[in-house]
Amino acid sequence: MPLRSEVRRWMRKSHDDSWPEHFRWLARFYRWRRRAFLEGVDRAVPADVTAIILVYGRPQNAETLVHLLLRTPSVQRVVLSNNNRLIHIRDWLTIQDPRLVIIDQPVDRSCPYRHEIARRYESPFYLLVDDDLFLAPSQLEWVLGALRKDTSRVHGVQGQLFDPGTDAFLHNIRNRETPVDVVNRLYAFTRVHLREFFRLVDLLRFGPGSREWYQSMWDDMVLSFSGNTRPLVHEVGTFIDCPLSSDPTIAVWRQQGFFDFRVSLFHRLTALKSLSP
């Protein structure tokens, strides 16, 4: 791993955590990563998945994420998009692999742009992973295997349920096999879902050139409606969250108006399309 990545991981803690909490997380992370890097994975699957990672405020996670994805047998290529023009992402990487595609964006990009990247690569299956979430290759394969068995919906490991009684979302639905209304942070989907995503984007008028296209508040919601049935999250065992996933200087969900925007969008999406349970 690049030295600068490990130094930043040690020195950059979440504003919500104390230093002792941060050091305990580091110990858990390194134990988990060692096991994930060494585990054996069944390779009797086709390599037909395009995986995409966006990096903006957490470049120290890039090498670990790329390594985990390249060790996942289903993954044909990994596209790493550096969405922060102030960062030279190659300074944070030592991996050299023909399956790794690195894109340095000329301007800062938002989350919806990853779907534009996906559209450039003809592939039956796609995997989007946020840069604050670590899953082992076997866990990624579990989700991709579920997608292969059921292509009617988007698959993931964490999501949200909408509660009509309170007109709000229940968050952090994870560690169980269950349908959700919105899947978050990791998304396994098909080329058909990608086309439907852009159809819904057009209906919402959220496409390139709109104000919403440059906001990172909504693409997970629209993608969740791109199937015919509700998204499904899976029980895959212990995975690791980066503590900076809740850091107010980075995390989009900490922005003012985030939740109100998403509730309003959920109502618009349910008016446009109903999903089977």
Q: Residue ranges of each PLM-predicted region?
A:
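C-terminal catalytic/acceptor-binding lobe
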Residues: 2-34, 42-46, 60-65, 191, ...
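Active-site beta-to-alpha loop of glycosyltransferases that engages the nucleotide-sugar donor
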Residues: 53-63, 84
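Short, acidic, metal-binding catalytic loop of nucleotide-sugar glycosyltransferases
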Residues: 67-76
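Short internal beta-strands
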Residues: 79-82
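Active-site-proximal specificity loops/subdomain of glycosyltransferases
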Residues: 84-121
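Conserved catalytic core of nucleotide-sugar-dependent glycosyltransferases
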Residues: 118, 134-208
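Short aromatic/hydrophobic "clamp" motif used to bind/position activated sugar donors
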Residues: 126
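Catalytic metal- and UDP-sugar-binding loop of GT-A-like glycosyltransferases, i.e.
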Residues: 129
